[in-house]
């Protein structure tokens, strides 16, 4: 058992919750995991009181697949690295850097694996992908898919086919040959998988 007071979970937004916590005189050190802008704000507040701060910022968790990879193992690892939590985790591998010599074979197998996913009620044992947390996030995902298609990005699996009226459901969505400079590469917390190639 954890003794009382050792672990306290306080939820809220940065300006209403995080800032008062960092400013509190009983807080002697700060650890922050999140976006770069949030980290800058936390560091600024902590520095005003000369509190040490440790940060893990940004990134969007790229996964890298080399030409000598076991394709089946890599496909399963990549799929399980993003889709089960709907990409709604800071450790979701939402970017895939894949060697150009294996991208076609890899993508074909990844699409097959993703098509076997069961999107639905997370309380059902057969479900492998639950809903998006809220409407704003759900609509952002749909907008990103629409925008990417209009810009001509190669959509190889469209998760919008899983959309329904009784919740914020969307299936795995995969874009292939996406440049690292596009907004899809760092897109936050979604079912979107953006494939980039390297040589």
Predicted regions and their residues:
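PLP-dependent aminotransferase-like
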Residues: 1-18
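Single conserved hydrophobic/aromatic residue that forms the stacking wall/gate
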Residues: 191-194, 198-199
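ALDH superfamily catalytic-core signature
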Residues: 29, 37-179, 187
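Beta-loop-alpha module in the N-terminal Rossmann-like domain of NAD(P)-dependent dehydrogenases
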Residues: 13-20, 34-41
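Glycine-enriched alpha-helix->loop->beta-strand junction motifs that scaffold or abut catalytic
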Residues: 25-27
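Short acidic alpha-helix that forms the nucleotide-activated donor recognition element
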Residues: 19-23, 186
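Acyltransferase donor/substrate-recognition loop-hinge adjacent to the catalytic core
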Residues: 183
């Amino acid at each position: 058992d954890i003794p009382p007071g050792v672990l306290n979970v306080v939820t809220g937004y940065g300006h209403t919750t995080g800032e008062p916590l960092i400013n509190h005189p009983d807080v002697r050190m700060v650890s922050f995991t999140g976006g770069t802008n949030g980290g800058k704000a936390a560091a600024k507040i902590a520095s005003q009181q000369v509190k040490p701060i440790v940060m893990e910022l940004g990134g969007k968790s790229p996964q890298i697949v080399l030409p000598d990879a076991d394709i089946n193992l890599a496909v399963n690892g990549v799929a399980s690295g993003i889709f089960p939590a709907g990409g709604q985790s800071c450790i979701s591998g939402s970017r895939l850097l894949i060697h150009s010599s294996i991208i076609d074979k890899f993508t074909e197998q990844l699409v097959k694996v993703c098509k076997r996913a069961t999107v639905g009620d997370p309380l059902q044992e057969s479900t492998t992908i639950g809903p998006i947390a809220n409407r704003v996030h759900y609509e952002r995902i749909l907008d990103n898919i629409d925008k990417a298609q209009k810009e001509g990005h190669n959509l190889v699996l469209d998760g919008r086919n899983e959309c329904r009226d009784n919740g914020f459901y969307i299936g795995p969505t995969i874009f292939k040959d996406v440049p690292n400079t596009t907004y899809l590469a760092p897109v936050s917390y979604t079912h979107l998988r953006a494939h980039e190639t390297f040589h």
